[in-house]
């Protein structure tokens, strides 16, 4: 099967499932952002800051694991914008947390929490 035929087969499968109809088999489209980075030999920080690297990592996994579809990159963000907005509790890979760790909530000390019981 050539690339175009494979694409059409997967597209049909995916769209059929989205229409709540019965595809030939269950389409696979995992949400595995941090995994794709690690599998491609990259850090979470690299894929969070470089969309091209993130996309290449997603494509590598899609090809090697035979996925039907893939999210181009769920972890790419404009980190400067999030920092400028003053998001104090948002851990960005390589900024406040290790580069190998995915995005995290940074819990403040209880006496500094903005939400209290």
Stretches with model-predicted labels:
Residues 1-117:
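Catalytic cores of TIM-barrel enzymes
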């Amino acid at each position: 099967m050539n690339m175009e035929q494979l694409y059409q087969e997967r597209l049909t499968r995916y769209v059929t499932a989205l229409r709540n109809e019965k595809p030939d088999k269950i389409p696979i489209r995992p949400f595995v952002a941090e995994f794709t980075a690690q599998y491609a030999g990259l850090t979470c920080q690299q894929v969070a800051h470089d969309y091209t690297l993130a996309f290449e990592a997603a494509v590598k996994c899609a090809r090697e694991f035979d996925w039907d579809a893939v999210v181009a990159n769920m972890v790419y963000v404009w980190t400067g914008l999030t920092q400028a907005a003053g998001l104090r509790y948002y851990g960005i890979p390589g900024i406040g947390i290790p580069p190998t760790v995915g995005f995290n909530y940074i819990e403040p000390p209880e006496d500094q929490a903005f939400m209290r019981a």
